[in-house]
């Protein structure tokens, strides 16, 4: 799908952050593993969350959805699988479920779409083979079989935290206790602690023995509860960058105290010179001169694409470090954003996991044709921010990719002054 984004008027208005996708994944799985009825409120049924709800229904729960909520009734046991578990394009769904699948006592196969089955699973592959379990991955799907055992687990701390969270979901349900030793540096620690916090709401505990070691008591059980998902800082980053550049944007629905690592967007914008205030009504941005800064993306990789847009619109140079994982997402986000930003005159270069963006707002121009969304929701939304921030109408293909995380994105930005045309 092609979409053209341009300014219908000057930028300004109020937008509500959508529910946190990261927290919703975790709440749905904890509810599914709990015997009994849980009610999860403030949900957005993106493709990723729908994939996790569908997987829960296949494995161990009854699921009933409303307009923005879901009742998840955990069965207290796993059911025989008649078909592979479809994870769609959701890396979180797949990586969270692989260890859970090892609790079922059966072979479990997973399928996916897009680049999902190309994304690396070497952490689990090595772990399963070490325990003598079956782990088979191909372009068509992935199959695991065999039961994990309680004990000592060693994982690199600089891999995706999704692997660590996946083990955190499953290990408390084993008969004995386990210890997770994370080889430093530990990146995305906030996502690990988010998993632990959501688990705690459902009655499951773990604790840090030191900054690199997690103790996970065995013999635990998840308990049903009512859970409200807070607003999503990773999605709020898009209107936040727009507000920092143009001013007069207010974002509502974000918790002041949060474990979301992507809340770092506010500190990054502040260091760039952004002016904003936080009140009971939300976070309100004023227009201010912005300058480039040095950004460490290790704990907030999802912010990468929109921060590359921000860098173009700042004075001076922005350097984004520890961004290697961007190359392994729905697209190679570094290469994708480099190509599209250069198409509008942007000055961007990268080497490995380091991205250098030169502020060049005054030399940006309309591209020769449509920009490419690379079937990546964050690329499409970042290019939309670029269009509104610069006043340059941009046509972007693969615009339907937004349904992966924020299906209502284009409608949500209209009150900020956006005009969106579909083709």
Predicted segments with their positions:
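Short, structured segments at the rim of ligand-binding sites
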Residues: 1-423
């Amino acid at each position: 799908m092609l979409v053209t984004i341009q300014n219908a008027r000057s930028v300004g208005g109020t937008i509500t952050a959508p529910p946190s996708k990261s927290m919703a994944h975790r709440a749905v799985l904890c509810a599914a593993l709990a015997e009994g009825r849980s009610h999860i409120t403030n949900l957005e049924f993106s493709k990723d969350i729908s994939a996790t709800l569908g997987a829960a229904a296949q494995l161990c729960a009854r699921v009933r959805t409303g307009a923005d909520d879901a009742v998840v009734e955990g069965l207290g046991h796993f059911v025989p699988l008649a078909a592979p578990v479809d994870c769609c394009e959701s890396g979180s769904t797949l990586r969270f479920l692989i260890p859970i699948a090892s609790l079922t006592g059966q072979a479990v196969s997973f399928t996916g779409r897009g680049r999902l089955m190309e994304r690396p699973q070497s952490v689990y592959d090595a772990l399963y083979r070490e325990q003598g379990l079956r782990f088979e991955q191909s372009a068509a799907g992935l199959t695991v079989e065999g039961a994990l055992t309680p004990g000592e687990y060693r994982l690199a701390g600089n891999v995706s935290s999704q692997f660590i969270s996946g083990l955190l979901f499953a290990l408390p349900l084993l008969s004995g206790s386990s210890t997770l030793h994370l080889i430093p540096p530990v990146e995305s620690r906030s996502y690990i602690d988010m998993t632990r916090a959501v688990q705690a709401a459902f009655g499951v505990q773990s604790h840090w023995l030191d900054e690199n070691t997690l103790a996970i008591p065995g013999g635990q059980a998840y308990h049903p509860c009512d859970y409200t998902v807070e607003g999503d800082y990773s999605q709020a980053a898009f209107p936040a960058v727009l507000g920092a550049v143009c001013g007069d944007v207010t974002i509502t629905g974000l918790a002041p105290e949060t474990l979301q690592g992507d809340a770092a967007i506010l500190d990054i914008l502040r260091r760039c010179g952004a002016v904003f205030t936080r009140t009971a009504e939300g976070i309100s941005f004023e227009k201010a001169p912005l300058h480039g800064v040095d950004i460490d993306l290790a704990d907030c990789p999802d912010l990468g694409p929109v921060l590359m847009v921000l860098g173009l619109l700042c004075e001076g140079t922005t350097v984004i470090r520890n961004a290697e994982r961007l190359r392994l997402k729905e697209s190679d986000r570094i290469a994708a954003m480099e190509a599209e930003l250069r198409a509008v005159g942007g000055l961007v270069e990268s080497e490995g996991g380091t991205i250098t963006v030169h502020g060049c707002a005054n030399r940006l121009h309309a591209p020769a044709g449509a920009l490419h969304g690379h079937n990546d929701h964050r690329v499409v939304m970042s290019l939309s921010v670029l269009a509104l921030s610069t006043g340059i109408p941009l046509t972007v293909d693969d615009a339907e990719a937004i349904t992966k995380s924020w299906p209502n994105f284009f409608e949500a930005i209209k009150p900020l002054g956006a005009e969106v045309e579909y083709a």
